[in-house]
């Protein structure tokens, strides 16, 4: 068989493998997103205990959640991209999320006492808010950093560069759709009927299932690291500004609505759901738009 035919056949087989694993990977991202935002609601309730108010818990957890995700993506993303086993990275991240989140739920009383002692009985506002954000970030960092690495890991499993971005759009939309379901289920169903610990256990089971099932997905060869181009840097700046404005508006609306609503956590859950629905719809629309312009 001529070498050219071998290379073409290998490329076709690789494309078939990616296509065959795209939807199973999306289902894993739905479950992972459900667990992640379920944890966020659980952590918001926990943080409200040691910070003394639900609005403080919302702001601290939002900052710690997205800050940890950014740290994880920046710190682990390049290593995962160069790895020959991104599926194992993904499984390891899901396992770490499950273990750390269960530990936080089990040690809720101990963590609350430690944070209250750290803050003190009558803290100055600057001291109180500094410790609220810093302490919450450090407490949640292992889990949130692992969350930040899951999307790059699954993206590496599928090999985004070969399909014009359709895989990453599908994964992002699926992850966000799962997040919507996780917010609603945790805030309005699981926590009221099962409590914080059992809700965290439900989310942890999903993480463990994702960890095990992800090992069955195809693994692509490790990719060579590439330096970001000026165009890529400008896109990152745009995405940073978009995230800043999007979450900033969300927190602002939560702050305003606390003046007229009784329960900040439920208000936050509803607003977060609306934000995530729009984000998922945009990612799905982008994926369809790209698919009409890029050959499979």
For each feature predicted by the language model, list its residue ranges.
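Alpha-helical transmembrane segments of multi-pass membrane proteins
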Residues: 1-296
